[in-house]
C-alpha cells in the first residue's frame, strides 16, 4: 500500500497543467456589431466590413502559437481565408537624446545617429487579454510585451464597417531621454502569400512571388504600403499616418519598407 501511495503522489507531481490566459470582457458592449467568442485559448472576432461583407479574426492565446490564427473574409455567403499563422513583429531601436547642450526637448541637431543605440525585438508573453468597446471601435489588448527598457501590451483595433484594423505595440519606459525608431510587420513560419505587391513612387504596380529567405529586400514604395496576395484575398500593410512630423528641408523616399 505504501509503495502505490508514493507512486501516485509522484504522478500527480509531474502532471502537466496547461496555462490558461484570462480574457476580460467587462468593457465589451455585447450590443456592438463586433461579435466576440472567447475561450482560454482562442478569441474569435467577427465584424461588418462594409458592402454587406463580414470579416473574421481568430487570435490564439497559446504561448508558442502565432497570435493571428486566421484572417477570413466573407464573400458570396461563404468564408474565404486570406491568411493564417501570422505574428506581429516589432523592433525598437533606442538611443540617447542630448537634452543638455542646447534647449532640452526642443533640440533639433543632437545627431542621434552618431550616439550609441540598441535594437530590441519585442517579446510577447500573452499574460492576459481584454476586449473593450469604444463607440464603433473594438480594442483587443494582450498584456505581456517587453523590449529592453520598454514594457506594455499589444493592441489590435477593429473598425466597424471597414476591413481596416490597426496593430500597435503600446509601450512605455521610465528611462529618460530615450529616442525611438521602430520597425513593424507580420511574420509567419510558412509563406502565407503567393505574391507580394506594391506601387512604386510613380504609381506603377509591381508584384513578385513570395519566397522564403534569410534577408528582406528594401524597396521604394508609394503610400508606404505593401500587399500580401493569396488565393482567398489580399492584405495591405502600412504604418499609421503621422500625428506629428518635424519640419524638413528635403523629403526623400529612403526605401524603408521591407
What are these regions (language model features)?
Residues 57, 128-130, 153-158:
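Hydrophobic/aromatic beta-strand elements that line small-molecule binding cavities or substrate pockets
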Residues 17-19:
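Boundary at the C-terminal end of the N-terminal hydrophobic targeting segment
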Residues 52, 65-66, 135-137, 147-151, ...:
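Coil-to-beta-strand transition motifs
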Residues 40-121:
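Acidic-aromatic substrate-binding/catalytic surfaces of carbohydrate-active enzymes
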Residues 39-45, 134-141:
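Short, hydrophobic/aromatic-rich segments at coil-to-beta transitions
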Residues 4-15:
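Sec-dependent N-terminal signal peptides
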Residues 225-258:
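Beta-strand-rich recognition/accessory modules
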Residues 154-205:
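Acidic (Asp/Glu-rich), glycine- and aromatic
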